[in-house]
């Protein structure tokens, strides 16, 4: 075999092995989601006619003049960036001062493990609103790659056991594995679609979806509402 043919053969072998590796890794990742339903498989009656603030995790005074809803996916890198870069400042300037009450709604659209991560958040929220916000910040800090299946049952159970204290872990485990709050996640998803949410993070200010490209634009719109 001459040198040129050897190089071509070697390159073909490497490409073939890489393709096999990618395929096997893909199969392993998706095997972790066995038994996790997609939205069409989550059954139950859902009526979307308004933002149901009373069903959402919240921060701030119920007497705040402005209500802001954040739609997010726990697998979304931009959502992680928003939380890491702006959340603490937003909380200091608007929530702690009583100007804004912030709500969270799931728009879990990236993959089925997005839905599972969202349902884990719902399970924690139904035990403690405050502990939900611990989960919110810490899960983003431990976020995996968007293109990979990482928010698996095993990961989420271990994560919550090690990182979120002050909840009934056995109740959480039961709710996660039995998909207790999957319908709540689907309701959030349907609400997002009803109001035209098409990405994350996106925000709603006093029932109005706003299209923004920067933190400064978000706070400017909030300031306008405060002074109205």
Each PLM stretch: what is its role?
Residues 72-74, 80-161, 195-198:
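Structural alpha/beta surface segment adjacent to cysteine/selenocysteine redox centers
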Residues 68, 76, 203:
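Conserved S/T- and glycine-rich ATP-binding loop of Class I adenylate-forming
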Residues 6-14, 39-50, 64-67, 81-86, ...:
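Short N-terminal helix-initiation segments at or just after the protein's N-terminus
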Residues 51-54, 60-62, 77, 85, ...:
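Surface-exposed loop/turn and secondary-structure junction residues enriched for glycine/proline
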Residues 56, 105-108, 144, 173-176, ...:
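Conserved short-loop catalytic and cofactor-binding motifs
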Residues 1-39, 71, 87, 159-228:
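C-terminal cap of thioredoxin/glutaredoxin-like
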Residues 26-62, 67, 92:
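N-terminal, intrinsically disordered, polar/charged segments of Gram-positive cell-envelope systems
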